[in-house]
Regions:
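Extracellular glycan-modifying ectodomains
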Residues: 1-398
Length: 398
């Protein structure tokens, strides 16, 4: 046989063998991938489903029921995708693993949270919807005009992204909340007092006015705001001496859950005023439950330990005190108020707290029944800018 022809045949045989091996490898890889996907699918379907994520502090999406209506309106596929993501096997471990990889390659952000110096986690602020913000401010101005005989104050608290701007990663893009605060101040100042606590918080940043792992201010931050606004609130001689109690050293907040970074724990403290004989009790109006303290101890055994203040948010809470001075304070609030209100207790005969997100009754009627003399709007800026419930509540009262 011609040697050249033989070499060509040998070459063709080798190519055929390589081609068959390549096809076999492809089949094996495809089979292996199918087995892996099948195993993961079965594990995801068979492992114990969770209703709530302790780490993320939120309710998880359950697998939806398949109905013709849910298929037609698209809700079935939407909920199914959310359920696959929420119920994924070992989800918390995958989130933590992703964060570690991101940090190794220099990422300074995780799921909308900046990973900042000194182990601080700071939520990335969003620019407000001008229409939503304008609607809220208009409702507040109309409410103030209707009740111009009352002492009315707005305290819109800047978030850590503004107060602790120096802690953000270098060149990190972040919406400047200072412009939003200016807009709010300009809108409200003609019709009510405006308590700007930005400088008071900035002055004590290194003392810890925000939690490292949570979006709330600390009890110290709340005290700094109280001290800066007391005169504006009509408190002539505010208490300056407190005994500070440590409630827990193991608080991991919502930003640790959201980012997946669990490398720090926060301390929650309570400030006990000294030199006052004013006593009080708390009434949770929706349940008619009474309590002798604003602090709910069992909350310290839960994931969301910040709910030690009043047990979290409620539609309506009343604090009745022995300060027989006729001052009745109505507060429209979010959760920032929960750690602020304890500082107000010695100075009012009654404090009425409304969380508009959960309150649906007639505010006007409530104000008349309680004989309200003072009103305070207390929100953090991020919540306030996106909130629609306050305008609805005030609109119902107008």
């Amino acid at each position: 046989m011609n040697p050249q022809k033989k070499r060509r045949q040998d070459s063709e045989k080798q190519q055929l063998i390589l081609q068959r091996n390549s096809q076999l490898h492809g089949v094996l890889l495809a089979a292996l991938l199918a087995v892996v996907l099948l195993v993961f699918g079965l594990v995801n379907l068979l492992h114990t489903k969770r209703d709530f994520s302790e780490n993320e502090n939120r309710k998880l999406q359950a697998y939806p029921a398949l109905t013709p209506a849910s298929v037609l309106d698209g809700s079935f596929m939407s909920k199914l995708q959310s359920a696959f993501a929420d119920q994924f096997f070992a989800r918390d471990h995958w989130i933590s693993a992703k964060l570690r990889i991101d940090q190794l390659i220099g990422q300074k952000e995780s799921n909308g949270v900046y990973l900042c110096q000194d182990n601080y986690l700071i939520e990335i602020p969003e620019a407000p919807d001008p229409a939503v913000l304008d609607r809220t401010l208009t409702a507040m101005k109309e409410f103030a005009a209707k009740h111009d005989d009352l002492r009315m104050t707005a305290m819109i608290v800047p978030n850590a992204s503004l107060v602790m701007r120096d802690y953000l990663p270098a060149n990190a893009p972040a919406h400047n909340q200072q412009e939003d605060l200016f807009t709010v101040n300009q809108a409200l100042s003609p019709c009510m007092q405006y308590a700007d606590v930005t400088l008071a918080l900035k002055a004590h940043v290194r003392d810890g006015v925000f939690y490292r792992t949570d979006h709330h201010w600390t009890s110290l931050g709340a005290y700094c705001a109280f001290d800066a606004s007391a005169e504006l609130l009509g408190i002539e001689t505010p208490i300056t001496n407190y005994r500070v109690h440590v409630l827990t050293n193991s608080f991991e907040g919502t930003l640790a859950s959201k980012s997946g970074k669990h490398t720090a724990e926060d301390t929650i403290t309570a400030y006990e005023p000294l030199g006052t004989d004013v006593s009080y009790y708390v009434l949770y109006d929706s349940t008619q439950e009474k309590a002798g303290s604003v602090f709910v101890d069992f909350a310290l055994d839960t994931k969301d330990k910040y709910t030690v203040f009043f047990g979290g948010n409620h539609p309506l809470v009343t604090i009745k005190t022995t300060a027989n001075n006729g001052k009745i304070l109505l507060i429209f609030k979010d959760s920032y108020a929960n750690s602020f209100v304890p500082f107000l207790i010695p100075y009012y005969q009654q404090i009425v707290m409304i969380d508009p997100r959960y309150y649906y009754d007639d505010v006007e009627q409530l104000m008349t029944q309680r004989g309200v003399t003072d009103v305070l709007f207390l929100y953090n800026l991020s919540t306030f800018s996106a909130d629609t419930a306050l305008a609805d509540t005030l609109g119902a009262a107008s």
